Design a protein with these regions (language model features):
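Short beta-strands and strand-loop turn motifs
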Residues: 16, 40-43, 71-76
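Cationic, amphipathic, low-complexity alpha-helical segments enriched
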Residues: 1, 5-18
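Short loop or secondary-structure boundary microenvironments that flank
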Residues: 17-18, 45, 135, 160
């Protein structure tokens, strides 16, 4: 198994794959920690997404006081991206669920395929957070979170213009990893993510 190979190797690891760690994360982290290995994991290495994630959590804390606002999410990526919703969208959703008492799980909303066909629905229970996904063109990644009430809407968006932000974050993470041990993530690199 991949995780046993990881545990016996004598190198540092980056795993920018959310699905793999959702399935094997606890075991991989345990094997790395027990074996004196270093693992740095993130669903997204972008510096901008890290900042956006902190803003997202803070906004969810504020919105917890205002039940008239419902929250939804959308993510847009290039046509080659197969998973939906994206790992970044799931991570952002988890940040909302941690801070907004009226939501306790995320669900897949609509999915717009590269050919324009739409499946799924944005309809969900009051305790669910809908994440809609769009696949079009060569979009590096757009994530939007919208709080909507009868009076107004509040929307925050991160729009990657290219892959430079991902590369910068990966370099910063690699530099950090070279000086630290254990199971690490973006909240270790950027402590503001822990708030």
């Amino acid at each position: 198994m991949r995780q046993r190979v990881i545990a016996t190797a004598k190198i540092l690891f980056f795993i920018p794959n959310l699905r793999f760690l959702f399935e094997h994360g606890d075991e991989v982290k345990r094997l790395c920690t027990e074996g004196g290995k270093t693992l740095f994991w993130s669903s997204n290495f972008s510096l901008g997404v890290s900042i956006f994630s902190a803003v997202n959590k803070y906004l969810a804390k504020i919105m917890n006081q205002f039940p008239a606002y419902d929250v939804t999410m959308s993510e847009t990526h290039h046509i080659h991206k197969m998973d939906a919703p994206s790992g970044t969208a799931i991570t952002l959703a988890e940040g909302i669920l941690e801070n907004l008492d009226r939501k306790d799980k995320w669900v897949e909303g609509t999915f717009q395929a590269p050919d324009g066909t739409v499946s799924g629905s944005t309809e969900c229970a009051a305790n669910e957070l809908s994440i809609s996904s769009i696949r079009e063109g060569e979009v590096p990644g757009i994530h939007s979170i919208r709080y909507d009430s009868e009076a107004d809407s509040i929307t925050i968006t991160h729009d990657a213009k290219n892959r430079r932000g991902f590369a910068l974050g990966a370099v910063l993470a690699a530099e950090y990893t070279a000086k630290h041990e254990g199971a690490l993530g973006m909240s270790d690199l950027f402590p503001f993510l822990k708030d």
